[in-house]
Amino acid sequence: LAGDRVKQVKKRTWLMPQEVEVWYVLPALRRELALAMIRKELPQKQIAKMLGVTEPAITQYKLKNSKRARGDQVEIPGDFMPEIEKAADKMTRAWSDQPSPEVFHETMTREVNRLIKALRQAGVICGIHREHCHGVKEDCGAC
């Protein structure tokens, strides 16, 4: 069907798991954090500053999946959304209470690391690795 395009995933020869996190997982986490903050009615300008992206990037995150140019390579499973919301809450509080930028950045780093660790433990990052890279065994236990 013309309207139903299946996105072809170009597989690479090999990626280290950290590259998968940088190229695929972090952009998707930024997108989901931005959307959580939008639902909390934070201004786009503030969200962009918090996440270290441009305002047009936030606008892209709001588009439907197939229309996005940013953070569109992978989907974060729905059962992780409560954790995304929790991280967005902590980051928003740290931003508004911010005695210094360092305190906010430490909170953001801690929350993003917590989310990545949870995704890794649940095998989500392994699934993304298999989807985007040749030769990742189904029972790979390297991470």
Regions found by a protein language model. Name each.
Residues 2-7, 83-143:
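Helix-turn-helix/homeodomain-like alpha-helical modules used for DNA recognition
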Residues 8-29:
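Short, Lys/Arg-enriched anionic-surface-contact patches
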Residues 25-41:
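Short, amphipathic alpha-helical "recognition" segments used to contact nucleic acids or chromatin
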Residues 43-50:
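Short alpha-helical "recognition helix" segments of helix-turn-helix
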Residues 58-59:
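Helix-turn-helix DNA-binding helix
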Residues 62-63:
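DNA major-groove recognition helix of helix-turn-helix
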Residues 69-86:
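Short Lys/Arg-enriched helix C-cap and helix-to-coil transition segments
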